[in-house]
Amino acid sequence: MTEVLDILRKYSEVADKRIMECISDITPDTLLKASEHLITAGGKKIRPSLALLSCEAVGGNPEDAAGVAAAIELIHTFSLIHDDIMDDDEMRRGEPSVHVIWGEPMAILAGDVLFSKAFEAVIRNGDSERVKDALAVVVDSCVKICEGQALDMGFEERLDVTEDEYMEMIYKKTAALIAAATKAGAIMGGASEREVEALEDYGKFIGLAFQIHDDYLDVVSDEESLGKPVGSDIAEGKMTLMVVKALEEASEEDRERLISILGSGDEGSVAEAIEIFERYGATQYAHEVALDYVRMAKERLEILEDSDARDALMRIADFVLEREH
């Protein structure tokens, strides 16, 4: 795991440099500070690193994908700022959320300006066909993120969400941006159509595994590792693969009990919900689905020539399920 973190640190520095070049001219100073708050707060920077590694894995120069990598991270940060407002989350990456420090109006503006700067980051690479194609990928991912968020919000009022609907939601909300990172990075590296498709699939599959593993950690990890109470997704009534599976498989009595616990905010009942997950194999099922997606992601890399970048992508796929938060 340490080796993967070193890889991410090395490649994220390239993206961070381009990000700071793009946002340094934001005025007034209050908006600049609000905009850079989460960017400088840390995070693993998996998405921009994947863009750079995908470029390198097809024989390109990672620097050629720096604009795309920066754009992907700017879009991710914009989405986090707005998510925190919508969910009224007060902490992010161990720091107070942007809206907590600067208020909601300024936080909305910070998200908006980062969203705008993302496109500036891409077009700084010129107007070649590669840049145009990569820009189209980035634009499409932004639409999907909004669609995914809307689906997620709609699920809060439903108890009949199917597994297919859930997978569509997490693909759009989480995996689409990761797939955009790997696809756009490959395009900037001059990849063949077959390589672009393979790397897009790789990003999609590890993105799906990433979100499912997040849901899984919420019930099997501990508060210290998570940085939040175990089962907080259950207390908040969030729809996860485990909830979908348990509601589908449970007896009428257990189903009604689980429904009464979801979104109740009662942390004392969370353990009971987790027991219901275990009873019907929902927890193990989620873990196995995530494992399958990682396996499929690694298989898609087999068409690439052996290289350090390809090896790093393989390691990152495994890292998705090795992380504890």
UniProtKB/Swiss-Prot annotation:
Q: Which family does it belong to?
A: Belongs to the FPP/GGPP synthase family.
InterPro entries assigned: Isoprenoid_synthase_dom_sf (IPR008949), Isoprenyl_diphosphate_synthase (IPR053491), Polyprenyl_synt (IPR000092), Polyprenyl_synt_CS (IPR033749)
Q: Which EC number applies?
A: 2.5.1.-
Q: Which residues bind Mg(2+) 2?
A: 83, 87
- The entry's protein name is Short chain isoprenyl diphosphate synthase
What highest taxon heads this organism's lineage?
Answer: Archaea
- Annotated residues that bind isopentenyl diphosphate are located at 44, 47, 76, 93
Q: Which cofactor does it need?
A: Mg(2+)
The family database entries (Gene3D superfamilies) matched by this protein are listed as:
Farnesyl Diphosphate Synthase
- Report the source organism: Methanothermobacter marburgensis (strain ATCC BAA-927 / DSM 2133 / JCM 14651 / NBRC 100331 / OCM 82 / Marburg) (Methanobacterium thermoautotrophicum)
